[in-house]
A protein has these predicted regions:
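Iron-sulfur cluster-binding electron-transfer modules in prokaryotic oxidoreductases
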Residues: 1-167
């Protein structure tokens, strides 16, 4: 992740520029959570979603853990529930799900138990590899979406509702 960029150039002439870049890089969850301007949001579905968050290993290592949850807790139409072991790996780990498929399936089975015990109907995450692993490892009635997708749906729902009331 670009937050680690400075470490790639340790001892090199580019180190200070890389560190400066790394300080400016923000994950979308950090940007939205820290932004003074919050766009209008509305429930993206007619019924309330029970949502949990899977912390990806990469984002957790970058120290981004509170912001995604804070965003989800603020979304209209969302009941946020913390699943057990939310910070435990889902078994995707980039290419790990291909390199050691059997172990990755045992790992995602534990994640499935955690999601099911939370009662969530939607799992949000910030990692494409985790999304693939969760989509294949969770029951089909549990949706898996990137947190940016969840935000986009809420923003679009607010825009649609604003258009309906303007008519």
């Amino acid at each position: 992740m670009l937050k680690d960029y400075g470490t790639l150039f340790a001892g090199e002439p580019e180190q200070s520029a890389a560190e400066a870049l790394a300080r400016r890089v923000k994950h979308i969850a950090e940007f939205v959570a820290q932004s003074a301007v919050q766009p209008a949001m509305a429930p993206a579905a007619e019924s309330q979603h029970r949502v949990t968050y899977h912390s990806s290993c990469h984002l957790r290592a970058a120290g981004v853990t509170k912001e995604p949850r804070a965003i989800l807790k603020k979304l209209p139409g969302v009941e946020y529930v913390e699943m057990p072991d939310a910070d435990r790996c889902a078994g995707g780990a980039g290419t790990y799900l291909v390199k050691d498929f059997d172990t990755s399936q045992r790992i995602v089975a534990r994640k499935r138990e955690a999601v099911e015990s939370s009662g969530a109907t939607l799992v949000a995450t910030s990692c494409p590899a985790c999304m693939i692993q969760l989509k294949t490892g969770l029951p089909p009635d549990v949706e898996v979406k990137h947190i940016a997708q969840v935000l986009q749906e809420s923003y679009e729902a607010a825009r649609r509702r604003a258009g309906e009331t303007a008519s």
